[in-house]
């Protein structure tokens, strides 16, 4: 009886040790997982948002052709002449659809700015509409706050048909192109500063196609956003993405879809070891140590 009792206790002790070891290992594994930053939690809570694309091509009467419009400047920017613009109506419609945030293209592929820029002359100051005093970004943000919608701003610096910027790069060769590239870099940084400092707290800053590499000739925008909009979502550059594109514009993502990712940025086809980047964007990586939500 004593031997049976001793063996029973040894067995119980072994089981307890095994369970304890498993629990410790699981706790260690969990402790290695990334956790969302406070602004990333806001992204989850927001659930549904809308994007308002508004640019010169709204008024040219043509079917939008991205390839041509990226390289051909609009001949007469005074075609921009809305007669019934009502950002309250935009945001009321978004709210009725269940949206909790809204994003406006402050500048898109033409390079035309929808605000009163002091650094980019190609903006609403240049047109006859509202005697050159219109500021649609301000109207939009005010409407968002009026109806309890979180405002975000979309900034397109990858393309600028007026200045001949194609995929972040100034067209041309030699010193001519280099000087224009440096000038454009500084212009972008100044525009981002304006948008980050004039309109109060923003939900998101979205760079169309990213913001290029500041270690090369790209604008160094992340420190600007961090300084003036520390709580907003940043999307994105070559070193940081608080959220990610789903790998296609179909409106769907892969299954399963993980929020974890192998590195803290997205849209990098040059990353070693990645064979199918769009697949990675669609599915994420269950073993990833960075958190980038869709």
Where are these regions (language model features)?
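Short, basic, low-complexity termini and linkers enriched in Ser/Thr/Gly/Pro
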Residues: 20, 293-294
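A composition/secondary-structure signal for short, hydrophobic, low-basic-content segments
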Residues: 8, 22-24, 49
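Bacterial N-terminal signal peptides that target proteins for export
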Residues: 2-14
């Amino acid at each position: 009886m004593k031997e049976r009792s001793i063996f029973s206790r040894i067995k119980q002790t072994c089981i307890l040790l095994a369970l304890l070891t498993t629990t410790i290992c699981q706790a260690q594994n969990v402790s290695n997982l990334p956790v969302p930053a406070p602004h990333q939690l806001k992204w989850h809570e927001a659930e549904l948002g809308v994007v308002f694309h508004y640019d010169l091509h709204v008024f040219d009467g043509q079917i939008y052709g991205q390839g041509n419009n990226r390289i051909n400047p609009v001949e007469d920017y005074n075609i921009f002449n809305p007669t019934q613009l009502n950002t309250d109506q935009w945001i009321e419609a978004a709210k009725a659809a269940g949206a909790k945030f809204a994003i406006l293209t402050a500048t898109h592929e033409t390079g035309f700015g929808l605000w009163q820029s002091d650094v980019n002359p190609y903006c609403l100051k240049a047109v006859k509409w509202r005697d050159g005093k219109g500021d649609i970004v301000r109207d939009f943000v005010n409407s968002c706050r009026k109806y309890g919608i979180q405002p975000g701003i979309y900034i397109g610096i990858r393309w600028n048909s007026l200045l001949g910027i194609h995929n972040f790069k100034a067209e041309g060769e030699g010193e001519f192109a280099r000087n224009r590239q440096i000038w454009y870099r500084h212009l972008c940084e100044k525009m981002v500063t304006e948008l980050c400092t004039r309109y109060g707290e923003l939900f998101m800053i979205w760079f169309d196609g990213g913001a290029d590499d500041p270690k090369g000739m790209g604008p160094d925008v992340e420190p600007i956003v961090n300084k003036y909009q520390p709580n907003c979502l940043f999307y994105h550059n070559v070193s940081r993405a608080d959220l990610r594109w789903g790998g296609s514009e179909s409106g769907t993502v892969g299954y399963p879809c993980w929020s974890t990712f192998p590195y803290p940025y997205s849209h990098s086809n040059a990353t070693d070891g990645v064979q199918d980047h769009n697949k990675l964007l669609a599915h994420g990586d269950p073993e990833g140590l960075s958190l980038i939500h869709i």
